[in-house]
């Protein structure tokens, strides 16, 4: 559910993360199409070969750029990272032009495999050029027949299926010193975002880049909001034809080295966010209809409500019983294709399938709590950004998780249905989720709200070691180690022992 900061150029180089695109389609005529190699013909129809759009300002590749003394990654020298985005009416196109030189054998291995990702349910990939240059001349050019479509499911190990495809090309006869140029665009809008557009531009990475060009064409008079991070300078803006042309040009961008052990909220990279959401309240209002419970009876849900209600009349015990049921009986599995990247599935379907992701489990929990008469609502959070979420531009990409905020007799409690089944006889014994700041999904929301205090985040573990040699130095001694965990530490230990 979130934009992931990357050390390399995976998001802007040879691999395009299509889920970050939020606009609608404006496709040029496509004289060539990729064949259906190992996917459906319908998906193959979403891949075109065509010239670049007329509005694109083509950038020259600095082929004479010297190889930096340090900072290269995997034998690659990134010569050009060009990204141009155009929003016009209800359409958006994201154009990329990247050029990478192989400086050694490892670099050849990497640049010879081109991967372009997109979601065929709402996006169209258009390949404009894929070429290999040697000594300044084009020695090979990729045609439609060379493209293979793969459904790799990159997040499979995390039990998430998103349905995105990878258009893959294995280039032939690539040598040390060759430059691979990839020019393509992606069109298409995830319907979950409605008519709102938002995105970002990166200006440095964990590798050096000889030339960086970023551009946003935006309709004049249409509201647009910016957030610049870590010293990013404002764009140079010109006006022409009813559009605002925002541009950045950077040369010889050095690499930025960041410790692998840095906390998840630490982001030293230079970048800019743009979008149409005026404030956090606007993001909350966007999410409200996604978590609106269906009217009328939900037989399977109502049956579970009746079971819990018959077992206890105490609101706190009802709350815990409902949450335990979702934690124990609904396993984690995310089917996040298309709009379901952010929209939950219906509670009845989740209960029938007995699996779901954080959105699905949250909506099912809300349905149970509604039936039990306990006020509750979803809360959007970011598990890594925590307090620094408030430094981001208000957009849906500021969040990557959702949980339940319930009102228990005036007490605000934060409960995560995706946790392993929790123990404890009351809320006081339960570990409440705390991710620093949360956005309550409600029409009345205006700002992010703080979650529990620092004491709730503390990992409490007591280790007691006793070496008993009282029987004498010539007798066996006894070593006893006792570990006592509390709070979050107890839940982590319990989960580890369960596996």
Description of each model-found segment:
Residues 40-58, 174, 187-198, 202-335, ...:
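Secretory-pathway-linked proteins and extracytosolic
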Residues 303, 338-348, 382-387:
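Short, conserved phosphate-binding/catalytic loop or strand-edge motifs used
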Residues 33, 38-213, 247, 300, ...:
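Lumenal/extracellular ectodomains and adaptor appendage modules
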Residues 324, 335, 359-453:
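Hydrophobic/aromatic-rich core segments of domains that either
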Residues 164, 175, 209, 241-243, ...:
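Short, solvent-exposed loop/turn segments at the edges of secondary structure
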Residues 11-23:
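Bacterial N-terminal signal peptides
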Residues 2-13:
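Bacterial N-terminal signal peptides that target proteins for export
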Residues 165-170, 305-312, 347-355, 390, ...:
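Second-shell loop/turn segments in exported
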């Amino acid at each position: 559910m979130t934009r992931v900061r990357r050390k390399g150029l995976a998001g802007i180089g040879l691999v395009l993360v299509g889920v970050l695109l939020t606009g609608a389609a404006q496709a040029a005529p496509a004289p060539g199409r990729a064949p259906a190699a190992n996917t459906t013909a319908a998906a193959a129809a979403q891949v075109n070969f065509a010239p670049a759009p007329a509005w694109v300002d083509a950038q020259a590749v600095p082929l004479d750029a010297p190889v930096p003394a340090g900072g290269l990654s995997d034998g690659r020298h990134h010569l050009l990272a060009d990204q141009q985005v155009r929003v016009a009416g209800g359409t958006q196109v994201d154009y990329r032009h990247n050029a990478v030189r192989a400086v050694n054998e490892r670099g050849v291995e990497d640049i010879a495999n081109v991967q372009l990702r997109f979601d065929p349910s709402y996006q169209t990939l258009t390949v404009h050029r894929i070429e290999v240059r040697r000594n300044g001349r084009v020695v090979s050019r990729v045609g439609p027949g060379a493209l293979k479509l793969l459904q790799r499911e990159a997040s499979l190990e995390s039990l998430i299926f998103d349905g995105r495809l990878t258009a893959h090309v294995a280039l032939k006869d690539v040598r040390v010193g060759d430059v691979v140029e990839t020019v393509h665009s992606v069109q298409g809008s995830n319907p979950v975002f409605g008519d709102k557009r938002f995105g970002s531009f990166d200006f440095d990475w964990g590798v050096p880049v000889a030339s960086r060009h970023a551009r946003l064409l935006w309709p004049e008079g249409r509201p647009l909001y910016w957030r610049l991070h870590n010293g990013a300078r404002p764009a140079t803006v010109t006006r022409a034809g009813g559009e605002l042309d925002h541009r950045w040009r950077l040369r010889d961008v050095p690499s930025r080295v960041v410790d692998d052990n840095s906390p998840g909220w630490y982001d030293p990279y230079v970048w800019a966010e743009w979008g149409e959401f005026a404030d956090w309240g606007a993001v909350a209002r966007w999410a409200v209809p996604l978590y609106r419970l269906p009217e009328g009876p939900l037989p399977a849900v109502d049956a579970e409500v009746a079971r819990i209600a018959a077992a206890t009349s105490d609101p706190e015990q009802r709350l815990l019983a409902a949450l335990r049921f979702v934690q124990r009986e609904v396993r984690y599995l995310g089917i996040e294709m298309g709009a379901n990247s952010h929209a939950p599935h219906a509670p009845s379907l989740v209960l029938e399938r007995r699996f779901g992701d954080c959105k699905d489990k949250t909506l099912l929990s809300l349905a149970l709590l509604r039936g039990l008469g306990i006020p509750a609502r979803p809360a959007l959070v970011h598990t890594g950004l925590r307090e620094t979420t408030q430094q981001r531009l208000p957009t849906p990409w500021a969040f990557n998780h959702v949980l339940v905020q319930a009102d228990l007799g005036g007490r605000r409690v934060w409960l995560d249905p995706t946790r392993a089944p929790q123990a404890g006889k009351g809320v006081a014994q339960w570990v409440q989720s705390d991710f620093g700041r949360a956005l309550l999904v409600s029409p009345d929301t205006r700002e992010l709200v703080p979650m529990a205090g620092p004491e709730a985040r503390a990992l409490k573990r007591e280790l007691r070691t006793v070496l008993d040699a009282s029987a004498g130095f010539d007798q066996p001694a006894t070593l006893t180690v006792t570990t006592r965990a509390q709070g979050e530490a107890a839940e982590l230990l319990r989960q580890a022992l369960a596996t």
